Amino acid sequence: DHGFIGEEDDPDPSTASLRWMVDPLDGTSNYVHGYPAYCVSVALAYRDEVLAGAIYDPVADECFTATRGGGARLENRVLCTTNPLQLSDALVAVSFPPHVDRESLAVTDFLSIIPHVHSVRRTGSTAINLAYLAAGRLDGFWVRRIACWDVAAGLLIAAEAGAAIVPCRHLSDPGDASLPRHVSLDRPAFVAAANKKIANGLHDLLAG
């Protein structure tokens, strides 16, 4: 018995141990405007532990995949994150909702981060951000509020490529930067980066 949870679905009341987390179009606004940053994201979880994930970018015709403990791949190429030595060298990305006001935490976070990194990108697709982190195209990423179907596949792909993940609920104590074994269904928040040094640097700026 399999359950499903996704942006286009009503909440699934089933108690199935295996669940598919599906976002059929991550980056909807981009798609509507013809901006080429959108994708399909699919993950399979046993209870709350993600076992496999795939992100397909139809514009670039790229498919990023991962299985827990089996590594991450772009087509047949094994993925590995970059290794920037300093936070100031890092190209990072952020996801936050549209129509934010200047007093919002999203703006505060952005202003806290941007002086300390090489540059910040906002692609409009969380799944693509995580796939690009896994592929070495980005060095870091953060998000405060997001749905599980937006990140379930991407978190696994990034972690299997070597990324360090710090949940935002641990902002007062970064601890060990590793992939949380459980994907929260109540809007997960986290910092992800190419290595622990960059992850903890971003984390500390957000905590400040």
Predicted regions and their residues:
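Buried hydrophobic positions in well-ordered alpha/beta secondary-structure cores of metabolic enzymes
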Residues: G27-T28, V92, L133, A158
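Hydrophobic residues within well-ordered alpha-helices
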Residues: A131-A134, A152-E160
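Flexible, acidic active-site loops/lids enriched in D/E/S/T/G that coordinate Mg2+ and/or position polar
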Residues: D1-R47, A54
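Short secondary-structure boundary segments
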Residues: E8, F96, R144-I146, C168-L171
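Conserved acidic residues
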Residues: S17-R19, L51, H118, D139
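Acidic beta-strand-loop-alpha-helix segment within the catalytic core
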Residues: V42-A131, H170-D173, A177-G208
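Short, Asp-centered acidic motifs that coordinate Mg2+ and/or phosphate
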Residues: G3, A52, L91, D139-G140
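Alpha-to-beta junction loops
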Residues: A135-G140, G162-A164
